[in-house]
Amino acid sequence: MEKQSYYGLGRRKSSSAKVYLTPTQDKGKITVNRRDPSEYFPNKLVIQDMEQPLDLTDLKKNFDINVVVKGGGFTGQAGAIRLGIVRALLQFNPELKKILKSKKLTTRDKRVKERKKFGLYGARRAPQFTKR
């Protein structure tokens, strides 16, 4: 018996995305927080970034994708969704790992905002130094 749905959790910056892939016979649609991606995200580049693993593997039409994403901004959310899609695709077919790993899509991007330190204006910006 074949699995009904595949799950992947993706994180990027302060965003977290739960991705559910459901096999379908239709053209395959994507919903992000119960909305269409073009309605949810402000620009097309973010949507292309999110759909990159599906374009690489030519599986865009094979799945209905339902995403629940929280936290962060649009770029972080798109990165979290992308990693979630990759992890769910690997559950579906582990042989896709070679293609996805060659484009560095299987690893989490661990870069996060550096914290502000006391005595400074930001993470690194220091007050102006006066010699005399």
Swiss-Prot record:
Keyword RNA-binding in annotation: no
One Pfam entry name: Ribosomal_S9
SUPFAM superfamilies according to UniProt: Ribosomal protein S5 domain 2-like (SSF54211)
UniProt similarity note: Belongs to the universal ribosomal protein uS9 family.
GO BP terms, alphabetized: translation
Stored InterPro entries: Ribosomal_Su5_D2-typ_SF, Ribosomal_uS9, Ribosomal_uS9_bac/plastid, Ribosomal_uS9_CS, Ribsml_uS5_D2-typ_fold_subgr
Disulfide-linked positions: none
Domain of life: Bacteria
A Gene Ontology term for the protein's cellular component: cytosolic small ribosomal subunit
Organism name: Mycoplasma pneumoniae (strain ATCC 29342 / M129 / Subtype 1)
UniProt keyword annotations, A-Z: Ribonucleoprotein, Ribosomal protein
Protein name: Small ribosomal subunit protein uS9
GO molecular function terms attached to this record: RNA binding; structural constituent of ribosome
Gene name, Swiss-Prot/TrEMBL: rpsI
